[in-house]
Amino acid sequence: MCLYALILVFLAAFTAGGHPSSLPVVDTLQGKVLGKYVSLEGFTQPVAVFLGVPFAKPPLGSLRFAPPQPAEPWSFVKNTTSYPPMCSQDPVAGQIVNDLLTNWEENISLQFSEDCLYLNIYTPADLTKRDRLPVMVWIHGGGLVLGGASTYDGLALSTHENVVVVVIQYRLGIWGFFSTGDEHSRGNWGHLDQVAALHWVQDNIDNFGGDPGSVTIFGESAGGESVSVLVLSPLAKNLFHKAISESGVALTAGLVKKNTRPLAEKIAVVSGCKSTTSASMVHCLRQKTEEELLETTLKLNLFSLDLHGDSRQSYPFVPTVLDGVVLPKMPEEILAEKDFNTVPYIVGINKQEFGWILPTMMNYPPSDMKLDPMTATSLLKKSSFLLNLPEEAIPVAVEKYLRHTDDPDRNKDQLLELIGDVIFGVPSVIVSRGHRDAGARTYMYEFQYRPSFSSKMKPSTVVGDHGDEIYSVFGAPILRGGTSKEEINLSKMMMKFWANFARNGNPNGQGLPHWPEYDQKEGYLQIGATTQQAQKLKEKEVAFWSELLAMKPLHAGHTEL
């Protein structure tokens, strides 16, 4: 246990005056759940923690590739004091992502299962009274193929800001997004799980001291994309009231596709199923064991690009798909028509989104590759289907970003900047503009800080890598300790911004730097060692790419994987 955050888990009755005299038990629609009290040093009010609360039936058997169903009721007091298994995924990659991003001091050993539709709740409310605190529902990232709830401890955010934090899980990879493109398996099962979790929150969170009329959804990377999809989805209407997308939106390249039939057929073939009809593929894949589907997952080499063979046969993600249910139309069309959930919205990116963690996990560009403009052009052409770039646009982009330098390290940095702009920067600004133009209150930020928790393998020049803001949002400097006063204050400031937004739909508050609304002046906040206002985030890049991509037929990049 670190000096800065001694976490006391009270598994017996409290003895101190004013503390609860027994463990927390709360009623849900399905039955009673037993939690535990946890306190953060320096705070008298403990947080009641409930881990592994079921919000849907286990998605097994005929419920594989099917919408989630309500959890079965129980008549006993369910013990919810230990972490649920994460949804099925590559266990090695899953552990790596957990260890890189967690705000825990200790690395926890993870378990994985197809039976994974559970959520974790952290509530500072006095459960003997009818508190109605703001609710913040976190949707984890991981490319829709990795990640889980228990990486993120909501204790610091909940304690410091007096909010109820709910961390949800959703089916991933083949289990979560397998789509034949028709009624046999429409896909987006993971997004339907997210919607089911939000319904559960509406039905139950008041018993945990939360206000079902003040729910903020927030997420990072594929979690940010999920938040953006839910903002655009008619299914999620009235299930949340504010939204925050960190480093991921519904226009993020590679995460949303119009049609994933070729991938469905590849999954079937790799699994040893016939791919002749949708019905036969779904029937055969439902007979496979969880271990067999995991074997298929590993053979698909998710999160990596095949730069030697036909790159169109390389699938780094099993993406969100146009299903006519979660997404009635492509995100671009929904944004243009201004027909979506116009809740207050924070959208942000990090300064070097493709700085280290993503290139390392995807081995893209290959670490041993000497980069010159010709090599960079070839590399981008091999991944143009993923980045949604027309091949004819690539030489123009390489010329703009690489600027004719002979230094391979400089070329690599510029290529990483190009990819970061295409995948994260430009789409985030376009979504923010669309949200603003629909009349909704919008805020933008760019995170510019290198956390002390960064991997020792990360080059010291990488500041504001993908995922770096999570440490601050979840209070890692407070929970893990051993960091500077500057980093602790940055975390406290970000938690305050996020929680103010959850309370009021506006991040501003006393003692904080002013965060301008993202209006026609396009003011935004640069968050880091120095936090200050700026204007027109990525304006030149958005103009460049918009002009360049105007030569591309509408949605051409979405027609196939």
Curated annotation (Swiss-Prot):
CDD domains: Esterase_lipase. PANTHER family: CARBOXYLESTERASE. Involved in the detoxification of xenobiotics and in the activation of ester and amide prodrugs. Hydrolyzes retinyl esters. Residues 1-18 form the signal peptide. It comes from the Eukaryota. This is Carboxylesterase 1E. Belongs to the type-B carboxylesterase/lipase family. GO terms for molecular function: all-trans-retinyl-palmitate hydrolase, all-trans-retinol forming activity; carboxylesterase activity; carboxylic ester hydrolase activity; retinyl-palmitate esterase activity. Gene3D superfamilies: alpha/beta hydrolase (3.40.50.1820).
